[in-house]
């Protein structure tokens, strides 16, 4: 068994139980668990003496877990027979070992015992002075001779709701049984009068119980034998759940009766009973149910045998026998026993009537009474029922008991008396039977005083904690209202000592939040960017302090200015860079508006990629504007090399942007215009291009290029459909386009596969053809020439393409590159950011891709700080992207102008 978690209570028990069965000895250091040493199955301590001998005194202190004499010993021990308790095992092991010829082993056995291994065979109880015996009960429970009070007070007090028995209709009188009893010539027969009584379980039962003893006693007559027998049997407590006992009594005898009737028909017919009883007298071993069955069913068949056996026997025998049997406690759950008693007899009566037609017939009844005399184990209700059923006959028996001979008359009289009593006590048996107990005094319910008294005064929602952080002016006042609060807050924060830290804090905050803003709230970020990092800073500042004191406008402004300044210096590098546009971003951010006049236009979209724009400006500010507008996202990508291009494409579709970027102004515009539609086509063509652009834009292109064609498709993810086509087209295109505008085209294509036709037309890049000859081609080349990023820009466009750039951004592209078209999805994964970012057109896409693209963006970012950042901003992954970006700056494709960015920008 595997080592259980031996520290949990549930396992400790299991552990100890299975310790002896385990395959390994657990070298636990328990000092007091006797169980560790005494295996329940093992002979009690006899082996203990051996152990000391086996183990040297030194060993006496602790069990040894290290192999003392070497592995051979362990092996031998393992091999050696080692069943039985540890001690036995050891002894066994020793011979085995010596037999093996392991001198060491034998030595160890004799000397240190199993010191060497932790195999089960080696397990040795410690040779410590025996721990004091454990309180844990030994394996089996040896019952003491003294009777054990089986019934708890609860059980004694318990009165079961009278559950109707099947076929027991208390409202229907049961006269038949009486006739049955009377039928037998034997007067005794009256005994098994009828069940009704049992049905009238209420008071009747009590009376029956009360009577029982006397009845039983009174029924000294052997005739009462059966009854007495039964009673005696009951006298001995029945072991087992009452229900079992009850069933036993009931069912057992139920079937029994017929048997009995046959059996006892002869004088010895009763013999069976006696036989059964004697048999029962000895305790029955085994589960009560088994016992019960044996008693009930056993007897069922047994009777014949017995009857033959005991034919000579006294007819009453059975009854008496049964009683004796009952006298000895019945083993088994009380319920089983009870049932036995109850049902057994229940039917028994009729049977008995036939059976006991002989003289002893009455015996059974009396027997039943005696049996009942002894307390029945089991829930009282069960017992009662059994008694009720049994006793019904028993009661009669009691009446008849003395001299079952008295016979019918006595039985009838008794029955009548019982019936009368019952009737007097309660009106109808039915009502009696199914009626809530009325003898219980109703308890007057006590209304508990409510424990919780709500405070009269209004609740003060101030805790000692919150109290520490109250502004000076912020003391709650009765007249609080919003205006007052605001004023208070304003005054609070405009205080000089507070203001300073405030301002400072915002600046600090700005750097961090800035980033956050970028990543988390692209829309807002876009706006911020648009506004300029300054505004972003302001926003940030505002956010920080604002939460605290929204009203502090002047300060906000101040702070914003400061922040803006800091941000501009910092943002250029930091903000934008952080955005993922890295370097480019910074500039763009700072000036986003200024960075690309045109760009800004596009920048709105760029906004997201504000940083990109700056980059673009680098190569092709003019282009950027157009492209930006169309593909502000793209611009960022290009920004690095061709920030503009990227943005353009990004915005609409990376693809257009790429060419546009360089040429971007018009192209971008066109692209933008067409871009949405065009990019897709371009994507097709572009994929091929991309690869080349990758080449051109070493950073972006390399990885990008490789896969770019593929990546494009991936980016195309957005344009999904496009991707396939682009791929197709792209494959061929790639070569040319790659060179010229592979990237751009790819991006565009990616983004706008559908657009391809137009795109292609509009932006040479977009169309595969275009790619080859189109201005796009030119553009692409330019881009490439001008800035590898251009290619990126397209990438941007093709959110999917981005992956290509991503490729550049090693992480993303790789996957993309491979499957570019299909991969797009993956690429986005890899460069999710890129893909998304790039797909300007795919605004929707962008969102998804963004995530994926974030990485892409970073790739571009690397090359074109701005681009990446924007995307980054847009895409939470910005951080990730950055790393990616570094691999492929061109990847600017960040195109990422995310949907978010885009949203923000407007």
UniProtKB/Swiss-Prot annotation:
Region 4 X approximate tandem repeat Mc, as annotated, extends over 222-405
Region annotated Disordered sits at: 37-56, 65-411, 441-651, 674-782, 817-906
Q: What is this protein called?
A: Microtubule-associated protein 6
Region entry Calmodulin-binding, spans = 1-15, 124-138, 160-174, 187-201, 235-249, 280-294, 325-339, 375-389, 435-449, 486-500, 513-527
Where does this protein chiefly localize?
Answer: cytoplasm
Start and end residues of each stretch annotated as Mn 1: 116-139
For the region Mn 2, give the residue spans. Answer: 151-174
Q: Which residue ranges traverse the bilayer?
A: none
In residue numbers, the region (Mn 3) covers 427-450
Lipid attachment locations (S-palmitoyl cysteine): 5, 10-11
Q: Which UniProt keywords apply?
A: Calmodulin-binding, Cell projection, Cytoplasm, Cytoplasmic vesicle, Cytoskeleton, Golgi apparatus, Lipoprotein, Membrane, Microtubule, Palmitate, Phosphoprotein, Repeat, Transport
UniProt modification remark:
Palmitoylated. Probably depalmitoylated by ABHD17A, ABHD17B and ABHD17C. During neuronal polarization, palmitoylation and depalmitoylation cycles regulate MAP6 shuttling between secretory vesicles and microtubules, and its polarized distribution in the axon.
Q: Which organism is it from?
A: Mus musculus
Q: Where does the UniProt annotation locate this protein?
A: Cytoplasm, Cytoskeleton; Golgi apparatus; Cell projection, Axon; Cell projection, Dendrite
